[in-house]
Amino acid sequence: MEYRRVKDQESYDVVSQKDIESPGERSLSSTSATSSLSTAGASKGNNSWKLKSIVTLALTLLTSSQAILIVWSKRAGKYEYSVTTANFSVEALKCLLSLIALYRTWNSQGVTEDNRLSTSFDEVSVYPIPAILYMVKNLLQYYIFAYVDAPAYQILKNLNIISTGVLYRIILKKKLSEIQWAAFILLCAGCTTAQLNPSSDHVLQTPIQGWVMAIVMALLSGFAGVYTEAIIKKRPSRNINVQNFWLYIFGMLFNLVAICVQDFDAVMNKGFFHGYSFITVLMILNHALSGIAVSMVMKYADNIVKVYSTSVAMLLTAVVSVFLFGFHLSLAFFLGSTVVSVSVYLHSVGKPQPQK
């Protein structure tokens, strides 16, 4: 009996000791878990911030250098290379990059119904329309520099916001807020102000041909963008790289037709890459990577990042053009680019809120 009482007392002491220590241990475990979650959250936040910063910087540099590289690729005021072959090279490179991305997806996830390349005629038949629109728009961007300089091009390029917004309303039946309509008016005013030339007999620096080409490019870009978005949203589960692949395939085909129509003799006699320089190669890489950067913005960042990149790119293009091409920064250009930046920002934040 005495022995049993001693054992019971020892068991009670052990249990009591556990009861005394448990709250502290639980508190310590809880503190450790909270600390781990906080550290993980902070690390995730830092990684997200770094990724957004890298994507923003990349998109800004690519956007601002597009017009500069096109102008810089000229020799004695004209293109020594064939612009149709350059366009074809851009589409081919984007197609290759899409295949590389798909290959990585197949290795990690396997081939599924949504990421396989084989498809139906009905699905593929919708891609020729945006492909040919993008081809014409991309060709026009080479010829518009006969009438505008690089900074003016960056300003006028924002006209596609207006065409995209109006076509969104007409084709996709999306409503535009009052702020967005006001942003359109500001955008037109900013583009016009930036082109004012008080020191010349001509009111605007850009001739009528440049404005017409800029408006046509904006319409083509807007319609192609809205049409492409409608295609993508028709089957949202479809891998974006598969959709891009087929779009770029048709882009290559149409650019091949353009080569045969416009530059067939020159390509056959002088070669496909005749007149290419290091700047030309950089320009092709820039155009291909710009599309990837925009996709990364949509996936890893948000639309406001694209807005900031566009605004900074306009000013950065102007500053670089001062040193490379002797561009003169005027008060009208500075005020106009500021108004354009504000209008782009208002268009982004003025999106109608979804009804609950």
Curated annotation (Swiss-Prot):
Q: Which residues cross the membrane?
A: 53-73, 83-103, 126-146, 150-172, 176-196, 212-232, 240-260, 278-298, 315-335
Q: Which ranges does the record list as Lumenal topological domains?
A: 74-82, 147-149, 197-211, 261-277, 336-356
- The answer on whether this UniProt entry bears the keyword Nuclease reads no
Disordered: region residues: 1-43
Q: Where is the composition biased (Basic and acidic residues)?
A: 1-24
**From the UniProt record, which GO molecular function terms apply?**
pyrimidine nucleotide-sugar transmembrane transporter activity
**Alphabetic keyword roster:** Golgi apparatus, Membrane, Sugar transport, Transmembrane, Transmembrane helix, Transport
Cytoplasmic topology: which positions? 1-52, 104-125, 173-175, 233-239, 299-314
Q: What's any one GO cellular component for it?
A: Golgi membrane
Composition bias, kind Low complexity: at what positions?
Answer: 27-43
The places in or outside the cell where this protein is found are:
Golgi apparatus membrane
Q: Where does the UniProt entry say this protein principally localizes? A: Golgi
Pfam families the UniProt entry points to: Nuc_sug_transp (PF04142)
Q: How does it sit in the membrane?
A: Multi-pass membrane protein
Superkingdom: Eukaryota
Question: Per the similarity annotation, which family is this?
Answer: Belongs to the nucleotide-sugar transporter family. CMP-Sialate:CMP antiporter (TC 2.A.7.12) subfamily.
Main function: Sugar transporter involved in the transport of CMP-sialic acid from the cytoplasm into the Golgi. May transport important nucleotide sugars such as CMP-Kdo (2-keto-3-deoxy-D-manno-octulosonic acid) in physiological conditions.
Write down the PANTHER family for this protein, in alphabetical order: NUCLEOTIDE-SUGAR TRANSMEMBRANE TRANSPORTER
Protein's UniProt name: CMP-sialic acid transporter 2
Q: Which gene encodes it?
A: CSTLP2
